[in-house]
From Swiss-Prot:
It catalyses: a ubiquinone + NADH + 5 H(+)(in) = a ubiquinol + NAD(+) + 4 H(+)(out). It comes from the Eukaryota. Belongs to the complex I subunit 4L family. Disulfide bonds: none annotated. Gene3D superfamilies: 1.10.287.3510. This is NADH-ubiquinone oxidoreductase chain 4L. It comes from Neophoca cinerea. The gene is MT-ND4L. The keyword Plastid does not apply. It is found in: Mitochondrion inner membrane.
């Protein structure tokens, strides 16, 4: 495994560990998810370019579109929760508290 792939895999791992550790606030969870999606995008783009997969050349763009949709939905959820409850704690998203 080359050093570039190792660094991208480490970025994904650090983002995943951050998602597991800092899950009390919604904003930190969204940032970790964005880091994971960015590292997946870079890894997929490099794989497509290095192996000359012509049929899979649209896959990184599709992943980037899904990442943008995820970011938009996450930020709208963050605004809704912060306006409703006054905080961005993930504990407020539990629907069983009603």
């Amino acid at each position: 495994m080359s050093m570039v792939y190792f660094n991208i895999l480490m970025a994904f791992s650090v983002s995943f560990v951050g998602l597991l550790m800092y899950r009390s606030h919604l904003m930190s969870s969204l940032l970790c998810l964005e880091g994971m999606m960015l590292s997946l995008f870079v890894m997929m783009s490099m794989t497509v370019l290095n192996n000359h997969f012509t049929l899979a050349s649209m896959a990184p763009i599709i992943l980037l579109v899904f990442a943008a949709c995820e970011a938009a939905l996450g930020l709208s959820l963050l605004v809704m929760v912060s306006n409703t409850y006054g905080t961005d704690h993930v504990q407020n998203l539990n629907l069983l508290q009603c």
